Amino acid sequence: MRLTEALLHALAADGAREIFGIPGDFALPYFRIVEETGVLPLHTLSHEPGVGFAADAAARWHGGLGVAAVTYGAGAFNTVNAVAGAYAEKSPVVVISGAPARAESASGLLLHHQGPRLDSQFKVFAEITCAQARLDDPRTATAEIRRVLTAAREQA
């Protein structure tokens, strides 16, 4: 099973009923697998704040996890107000973001949609979410998914 499939099944098992998102370059492989598998329906929206607010509303309405999926940098940063609001109100919203691959990250080149540093996005979300993870190691990814989803449920 691919990592994205494992993530989708874990989200569904923890009460997510759908994903709200906007496909973008760094997240396109994820979105392709979401559509291929059909584990959770994908609702594409036209503006990232709407993605965050829709995920928050879904979490509150259904009582499970709300899921927002966006691309790295500009896409994720555009969800900050909605995600911070959900965090303040203890609404369990999970944000899934694409990111540069290891080779791109190691290149030292400035990438489009990048903040001042490659980890700027991670640091911003550390301030407005109860848990964060980088799923870049298949050996630890399953445990990291479980840790983050458990934190989202328990701290809501």
Predicted regions and their residues:
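N-terminal alpha/beta PP-like core and its mobile active-site loop of ThDP/TPP-dependent enzymes
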Residues: M1-A156
